[in-house]
Amino acid sequence: MKNLYPAMPAQAIMMVRMVFFLQRHLEDRLAQVLEAHALSHSAWSLMLMIHSDPAQSISPSAASEALRQSRPHMTRIADELVARGWVERGHGVQDRRAVELRLTAAGKRALGRILPVMWAGYEKLVAGFSPEDATRLCGMLRSWLLELEQADDPLASTPREAGHD
């Protein structure tokens, strides 16, 4: 391919594609762990968001935005967790008209059972890294993520070849 397109940024393409492949593999492996608890990654992420929030609650729209999921999808996930008795809908503290999602006592117990299993899964996924390499990789990934989050349009400043509009 490089001989057909000498200006092709092979390393940049390889890096991005490898991250995509890694993301798929990581999600698949973690999904296997979550399936044992009849949970999807979205449901697990929602439970963690609620639990880690200082108010121990989150609005469905905020969860949708943070998890980059559609609102209808978040509603389905919340409905599933409500049906299991792990999440409840309530009125907002600041605005009684607003809906907030909170973990129930059963949801907190489930979280307490599943967290150690997930932690072991995470450790298994990165077991091949030395502590130094893991620290270095975390720093590089964090920098890359911050750069992407701060850019209005990361592709807008891409150089164009003359005559190829």
Residue ranges and their predicted role:
Residues M1-A7, E132-D165:
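C-terminal regulatory/oligomerization modules of transcriptional regulators
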Residues M1-H37:
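N-terminal leader segment of winged-helix/HTH proteins
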Residues M18, S45-M49, R109, R136:
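Pre-recognition alpha-helix immediately N-terminal to the DNA-recognition helix
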Residues F20, L48-A55, L115:
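Short, locally clustered residues in the helix-turn-helix/winged-helix DNA-binding domain
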Residues S42-W44, P72:
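Key DNA-contact positions within bacterial/archaeal DNA-binding proteins
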Residues A62-S64:
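A short alpha-helical element within helix-turn-helix/winged-helix DNA-binding domains
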Residues D79-G139:
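Charged, amphipathic alpha-helical coiled-coil/dimerization segments
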